[in-house]
């Protein structure tokens, strides 16, 4: 514990909060172009083929972004919108592609949780 005299001489330093999503530069989303679309395997104990794309953003950053939902239409040169949000079992993937915007189609035949996957309300 510092004495009052020590604190008068040299005040306490503020902790600087580090951003979880630096490539967004304090924006809610960013637009970018897919440079590579591929699948990758998660870390232990999970097992799957996770769909991921490498995206070159409008601000010059190049990041990996997860493509959520069943099936997608993305390929190289597709224009996508990305948001923050990491994938816990994929190291280095700290962004999600937003489904149903720009070149990314929404998930087909999605009945529940539609807003997260850009799916329209089905005709009853």
UniProtKB/Swiss-Prot annotation:
InterPro entries: NA-bd_OB-fold, Ribosomal_uS12, Ribosomal_uS12_bac. GO terms for molecular function: rRNA binding; structural constituent of ribosome; tRNA binding. With S4 and S5 plays an important role in translational accuracy. Interacts with and stabilizes bases of the 16S rRNA that are involved in tRNA selection in the A site and with the mRNA backbone. Located at the interface of the 30S and 50S subunits, it traverses the body of the 30S subunit contacting proteins on the other side and probably holding the rRNA structure together. The combined cluster of proteins S8, S12 and S17 appears to hold together the shoulder and platform of the 30S subunit. The modification 3-methylthioaspartic acid is found at residue 89. The gene is rpsL. HAMAP family: Ribosomal_uS12_B. Part of the 30S ribosomal subunit. Contacts proteins S8 and S17. May interact with IF1 in the 30S initiation complex. Belongs to the universal ribosomal protein uS12 family. GO terms for biological process: translation. Keywords: Methylation, Ribonucleoprotein, Ribosomal protein, RNA-binding, rRNA-binding, tRNA-binding. This is Small ribosomal subunit protein uS12. Coiled coil: none annotated. PANTHER family: 30S RIBOSOMAL PROTEIN S12 FAMILY MEMBER.
């Amino acid at each position: 514990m510092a004495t009052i005299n020590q604190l008068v001489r040299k005040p306490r330093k503020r902790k600087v909060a580090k951003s979880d999503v630096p490539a967004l530069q304090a924006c809610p989303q960013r637009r970018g172009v897919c440079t590579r679309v591929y699948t990758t395997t998660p870390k232990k104990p999970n097992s799957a083929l996770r769909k991921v794309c490498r995206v070159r953003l409008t601000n010059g950053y190049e990041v990996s972004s997860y493509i959520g939902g069943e099936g997608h239409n993305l390929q190289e040169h597709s224009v996508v919108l990305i948001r923050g949000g990491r994938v816990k079992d994929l190291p280095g993937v700290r962004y999600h592609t937003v489904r149903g915007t720009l070149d990314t189609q929404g998930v087909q035949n999605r009945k529940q949780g539609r807003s997260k996957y850009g799916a329209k309300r089905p005709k009853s």
